[in-house]
């Protein structure tokens, strides 16, 4: 697992299946995997393409570190366009008012994966903030359905 930021910025251990070659693994989580990079194992590519590498996060939900829906947990010092998210998006910490989720509004709208540019990073945070401002059971159900279709049925995992 990797250390991620939870509610109120509290660090927690995020559980995932290993999809990278051990010798090329980045335990910090700052070096994001891009596409089908050479660091991924053959099985790892399949797990990531179907998002099955996320299944161990059900344990994070059971022990209270995460919820089913909420902003996806990020690594401390996560970067976008070579700069810390907090520099790129000044209201970044607003997303930590809720526990992180297995899926979120940004992910359900296709905003996931590596963020090498400012625009996608800001859109991701904007979606997280919109989720918090419009939190409801109906929105959670919409996110769960969209995530299931996008990640598991169409295999759009990154």
Task: Show where each model-derived region lies.
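Conserved small/aromatic sequence motifs within transmembrane helices
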Residues: 1-158
